[in-house]
C-alpha cells in the first residue's frame, strides 16, 4: 500500500500495473504541491536520448494528466514561459536543472543521453548560467562495461 499523504506521490507514471485514475490524481496533487495545474507541468516519455522539447506556455488539455495520451519522446524540457514547472522522472539517472536568460531546462540524464550531449543541448537552449544536479546511481552500484566506455570515447575523446 502506497502512502497517499506525501506531497509528491511516487505512482506518477502510466504503466501496465498502474491504475490510470491513481496516476491522474497523483499528478494533479504533484502539480498542486508546486503551486500549479497539470497543464503547466511538461512531461515526456523518457527514452534515454538527447532530445529536448521547448515549451512556451501551458498545454491544455494536458497530456500530463490524461491517460492514453501519447507523450512526446523527450528526455528534457526547456520552458520559456511563466508558470511552467518542467518534470523528469528518475531512478538511476541524474536529474539536471539548468537556468539562464533563455529559460529553464530540466533534463533526464542517463549515460546514453550524456554521451549524446543532452546537457550541452540544454545549456545552449537556455544560455545556462547555473546548474543543479540531483541524486543518481553511483560507482558503488553501477558497473560500466566496455560498450559504455567506447560510447563516451567516441563522443568526447580520450
Predicted regions and their residues:
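Active-site microenvironment for binding and transforming phosphate-containing groups
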Residues: 1-158
